[in-house]
From Swiss-Prot:
It holds the Pfam family Pro_isomerase. This is Peptidyl-prolyl cis-trans isomerase 8. Residues 326-401 form a coiled coil. It comes from Caenorhabditis elegans. Residues 12-175 form the PPIase cyclophilin-type domain. Keywords: Coiled coil, Isomerase, Rotamase. It catalyses: [protein]-peptidylproline (omega=180) = [protein]-peptidylproline (omega=0). May catalyze the cis-trans isomerization of proline imidic peptide bonds in oligopeptides. May play a role in the protein folding, transport and assembly. One of its GO terms (molecular function) is cyclosporin A binding. GO terms for biological process: protein folding. Residues 432-447 have a biased composition (Low complexity). The gene is cyn-8. Its EC number is 5.2.1.8.
């Protein structure tokens, strides 16, 4: 399929790597094949929608978060920047479109998704032929300029989850239009062909023709002006007839006498003229019948005194190729019913996915609350254990103080008991010493 049949829109990215300008990537968008997908991508390139879902709906400032050499580079996550976010201009996601297009060459622009009918804002640019993605991802454009920039991004060093180590950012983006479309807007009305196949100057002067053309507002205004002009001409003719009526009545008598004289001269020729007139009249009737019975090119019989002849040249635009393709897609009742069933099944799957996602979110929220409660219980338990340990330590310290005080009291009692004993023992010692001295005296006396 030639490029002009696939589409005629252009978009561009200005890329920077680690803050340094790397170049521009220009895309050719296939708006005739995938109009909804192209409009989604184009709106994010221009940023014309402003803020949506709390984020600025534009690729400007977003990054290429995933790079796989020999496969593709991926970007377009305008919310999180890591491949988990993004949304479409039609809502959260939108359905797949024209999955018959193949990934049969490198540097194609395709939509990233998380399954059937989950397209958002993320996209990827292939660097090789990837037939295993056919029927799963929607191809809606190709790179026509800036292949070297794509190769430079592809050859960058990557880390965890194929994220490039260097920051690859879209610093500027937008839609490209042809210079003729911009310059020619001022004179578009003058240079634009008339919207009908019949021009006003081509119309016959008689009112006994059946004309078919689209009644645009301009043609209605011109018709009103022509009607007003015809009325003025009719009034002028009526006034001139009134003015010259008297002269005609005065000349009518002389003209009637002249006609009577000429009638006698023509009497010999009446036979021949009558036959010729009858032949001419019959020929005109046959031609008129032929014109009446002749249908149009489309096979439609037109009421009136003649067939359409003032069609003019083909100045209108040709039928777009995507219209022709749609007109050629005539479906049978069974095919239409099958398509409706597929659409219903797709809607059911989408509803089921939404339901599962809601259940998953509810489950995650419940688990989060349970984990929070569990952490709170563990914290309370730890505080209770610390309080119990503190109480036990206080009790042990009190017991130690009591034992220490009781031990010191018993020692004091023992010391008090020992002092009287010492006092009682000292007189005994003195008496024993005196007795020993007396015994020694007695022994000396005996000697």
């Amino acid at each position: 399929m030639p490029p002009e049949v696939r589409g005629n829109k252009r978009a561009f990215f200005d890329i920077s790597i680690n803050g340094e300008p790397a170049g521009r990537i220009v895309f050719s968008l296939w708006n005739h094949c995938c109009p909804r997908t192209v409009e989604n991508f184009r709106a994010f390139c221009t940023g014309e929608l402003g803020k949506m879902n709390g984020h600025y709906a534009s690729y400007q400032g977003s990054v290429f978060h995933r790079v796989i050499k020999g496969f593709m580079i991926q970007g377009g996550d305008i919310t999180h920047g890591n491949g988990t976010g993004g949304y479409s201009i039609y809502g959260r996601t939108f359905d797949d479109e024209n999955l018959a297009l193949k990934h049969k060459k490198p540097y194609l622009l395709s939509m990233a998704n998380r399954g059937p009918d989950t397209n958002g804002s993320q996209f990827f640019i292939t660097s090789e032929e990837v037939p295993h993605l056919d029927g799963k991802h929607c191809v809606f454009g190709e790179v026509i300029k800036g292949v070297e920039v794509v190769k430079a991004i592809e050859n960058l060093e990557t880390g965890n989850e194929d994220k490039p180590v260097c920051k690859v950012e879209i610093t500027h983006c937008g839609e490209m239009v042809r210079k003729g479309d911009v310059v020619g807007n001022a004179g578009a009305a003058a240079s634009e062909p008339e919207p009908t196949g019949v021009k006003m100057e081509d119309e016959p002067k008689t009112r006994n023709w059946l004309m078919r053309y689209s009644k645009s507002p301009e043609s209605r205004e011109e018709k009103k002006k022509d009607k007003h002009g015809r009325e003025e001409k009719r009034d002028r003719r009526r006034r001139s007839n009134d003015r010259h009526g008297r002269d005609r009545r005065s000349r009518s008598r002389s003209q009637s006498r002249d006609r009577n004289r000429r009638r006698d001269d023509r009497s010999g020729r009446d036979g021949r003229v009558g036959r010729n007139e009858r032949d001419d009249r019959s020929g005109r009737d046959e031609r008129r019948d032929d014109r009446r019975s002749a249908p149009t090119k489309d096979g439609i019989k037109v009421r009136g005194r003649g067939k359409l002849t003032f069609l003019g040249g083909r100045t209108r635009s040709t039928t777009p190729p995507h219209w022709k393709r749609e007109e050629s897609k005539k479906l049978t009742l069974e095919a239409h019913q099958k398509r409706q069933e597929e659409l219903e099944e797709r809607q059911k799957r989408a509803a089921q996915r939404e339901k599962e996602e809601a259940e998953r979110n509810a489950r995650l929220e419940k688990e989060r609350v349970e984990r929070q409660n569990q952490r709170e219980l563990e914290r309370q338990k730890q505080e209770a254990e610390r309080e119990l340990k503190r109480q036990q330590e206080n009790e042990e310290s009190g017991n130690r103080r009591r034992r220490r005080s009781s031990r010191s009291g018993s020692e004091n009692d023992e010391s008090e008991l020992e002092e009287p004993k010492n006092r009682s023992a000292s007189p005994r010692k003195r008496s024993s010493s005196s007795s020993s001295s007396s015994s020694s005296g007695h022994s000396s006396d005996s000697d």
